[in-house]
């Protein structure tokens, strides 16, 4: 017998009749509602970025169970603030400061545009949720809120044990409280006494702020006086801070670091943590041969893979390079596809055809020439004739949608062919990236066929690029064997003996601590939404909790000040230097991975 393990997300989703919609579908529906409510005709690819921002705001409102009508009240409408009895004095003061900034007579154009847009947000929020509900779907926050407020849910298990939480959103607090009242909820908190506030709530470190706040409401099932659990940060540790001139230099240093102190031998007790996950690729190329067992939980960017390059070449070929009226294609785009390394999985003749075209300087080769007069099935699939492109347009009332569906279907066919013909290739990155690319394009095809994705081809191409660039590929390794390579979020609730943090700069750790939101800070603060302060406290906890049981710690940061970089170590590194009594070694990484020891400033 063993207990059932689920994430908090699965717990919410399992008790809702709604399904959480995928991000592309959610943005497409939001785009339609936005256009209806505002009358602003914005192309989907231009809308996509701030559609994500708007969706994140709606998600935050629901996860923190705020009243959307009060959050989005009219800035010029002061009587909307008449009833503020539910707000604290501090919250009322925050609101007053914000609304006062809109009462002067020096309106700027930006301010007028913001007020105009803001006045529609409440309508967009309600209309959007209604549209999604009619389809039986919702964004994550809406689903969570529905579950948190539903008093009739039958929780089937006798016990729910919540392990390793830090900051709780209002929906989580509500769910915990519901289960606690049913005597079904038990809580295990993971922290260290070193960063917890004292009885008077005094501590310059915000890492333990939220756990200290929740422990009275949700008591710890573990004995808080056990030093083996809650008093580890002060224990003996070897700690080194290393400054580096570049990110690539840090990646190359990984091999040297792994080669000492039995770090490779200790396998799963060794972790390389990426505060900036963009350096994953150079790290993978720098791993020593002895490190034959590695588990990678950090996602690899789909846009940096060969299959993404092939998809780009295919898009260019089938749009800019397509001479469907002449039943031919432009050699410039044909060559890039035929010479791509994955072209051989479509047809073994690709290289031969490319050489022949170059030799005879056929700048607009016909379908017959490209397909060996129709005798090569792979090439026939790769270079469809003009009938393929024109038939769908003639059969459909909406030629734009039909053309997009045809284009997306063709991309799916080619990518699927590559995957099927290369199924015996052992390269995990190849297999994962090909599958991920297929799922992205196939999802767009589904949305196009059902009419949810109604855009022109130019917009579609830009949208595909945005989606591919933002998509990541999950690596499937063995979590209990080998060296662990992961991002900061993947380290939650895990302990390691040997720890190497890379790119631990201010801006990476804490990560993304900015108010990327339509909702100004003052209003977010007043209505209990997520703010910069919350994000800093969350990352402070991640950082200090990761160090607390480790004994061999190396933290690297980039000291370069070019290309907009500040060259600053993370604020958490500085705070740890001040708060702890450890003799931290300070070193600099020089050329050829040589190390120079220096005294701290």
Q: Residue locations for each model-derived region?
A:
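Nucleic acid-machinery interaction/catalytic patches
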Residues: 1-522, 581-594
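Accessory/regulatory regions of helicases
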Residues: 331-336, 505-601
């Amino acid at each position: 017998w063993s207990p059932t393990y689920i994430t908090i997300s699965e717990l919410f989703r399992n008790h809702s009749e709604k399904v959480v919609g995928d991000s592309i579908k959610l943005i497409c529906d939001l785009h339609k509602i936005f256009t209806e409510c505002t009358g602003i005709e914005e192309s989907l690819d231009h809308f996509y970025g701030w559609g994500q921002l708007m969706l994140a705001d709606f998600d935050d409102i629901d996860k923190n169970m705020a009243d959307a009508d009060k959050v989005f009240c009219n800035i010029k409408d002061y009587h909307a603030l008449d009833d503020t009895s539910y707000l604290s004095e501090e919250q009322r003061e925050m609101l007053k400061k914000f609304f006062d900034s809109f009462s002067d007579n020096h309106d700027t154009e930006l301010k007028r545009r913001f007020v105009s847009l803001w006045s529609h947000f409440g309508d967009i929020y309600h209309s959007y949720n209604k549209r999604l509900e009619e389809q039986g779907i919702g964004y994550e926050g809406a689903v969570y809120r529905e579950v948190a407020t539903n008093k009739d849910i039958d929780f089937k298990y006798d016990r729910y044990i919540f392990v390793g939480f830090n900051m709780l959103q209002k929906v989580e607090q509500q769910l915990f409280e519901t289960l606690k009242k049913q005597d079904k909820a038990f809580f295990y908190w993971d922290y260290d006494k070193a960063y917890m506030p004292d009885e008077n709530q005094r501590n310059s470190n915000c890492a333990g702020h939220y756990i200290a706040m929740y422990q009275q409401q949700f008591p710890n099932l573990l004995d808080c006086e056990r030093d083996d659990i809650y008093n580890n940060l002060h224990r003996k540790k070897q700690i080194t801070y290393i400054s580096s001139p570049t990110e690539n230099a840090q990646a190359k240093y990984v091999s040297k670091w792994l080669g000492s102190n039995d770090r490779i031998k200790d396998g799963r007790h060794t972790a390389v943590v990426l505060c900036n996950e963009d350096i994953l690729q150079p790290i993978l190329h720098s791993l020593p041969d002895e490190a034959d067992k590695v588990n990678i939980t950090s996602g690899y960017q789909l846009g940096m893979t060969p299959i993404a390059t092939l998809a780009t070449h295919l898009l260019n070929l089938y749009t800019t390079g397509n001479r469907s009226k002449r039943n031919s294609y432009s050699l410039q785009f044909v060559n890039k596809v035929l010479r791509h390394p994955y072209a051989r999985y479509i047809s073994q003749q690709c290289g031969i055809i490319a050489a022949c075209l170059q030799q005879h300087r056929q700048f607009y080769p016909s379908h017959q020439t490209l397909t060996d007069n129709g005798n090569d099935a792979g090439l026939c699939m790769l270079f469809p004739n003009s009938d393929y492109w024109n038939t769908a347009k003639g059969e459909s009332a909406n030629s734009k949608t039909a053309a997009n569906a045809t284009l997306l279907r063709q991309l799916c066919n080619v990518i699927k062919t590559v995957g099927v013909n290369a199924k015996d290739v052992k390269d995990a990155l190849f297999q994962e990236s090909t599958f991920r690319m297929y799922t992205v394009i196939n999802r767009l095809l589904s949305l196009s066929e059902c009419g949810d994705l109604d855009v022109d081809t130019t917009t579609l191409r830009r949208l595909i690029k945005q989606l591919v660039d933002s998509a990541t590929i999950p690596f499937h390794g063995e979590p209990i064997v080998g060296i662990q390579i992961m991002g900061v979020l993947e380290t939650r609730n895990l302990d390691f003996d040997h720890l190497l943090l890379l790119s631990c700069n201010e801006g990476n750790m804490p990560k993304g601590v900015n108010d990327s939101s339509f909702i100004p800070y003052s209003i977010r603060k007043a209505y209990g939404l997520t703010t910069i302060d919350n994000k800093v406290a969350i990352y402070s906890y991640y950082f200090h909790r990761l160090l607390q049981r480790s004994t061999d710690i190396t933290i690297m940061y980039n000291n370069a000040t070019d290309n907009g970089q500040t060259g600053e170590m993370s604020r958490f590194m500085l705070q740890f230097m001040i708060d702890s009594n450890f003799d931290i070694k300070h070193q600099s990484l020089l050329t050829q991975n040589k190390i120079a020891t220096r005294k701290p400033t």
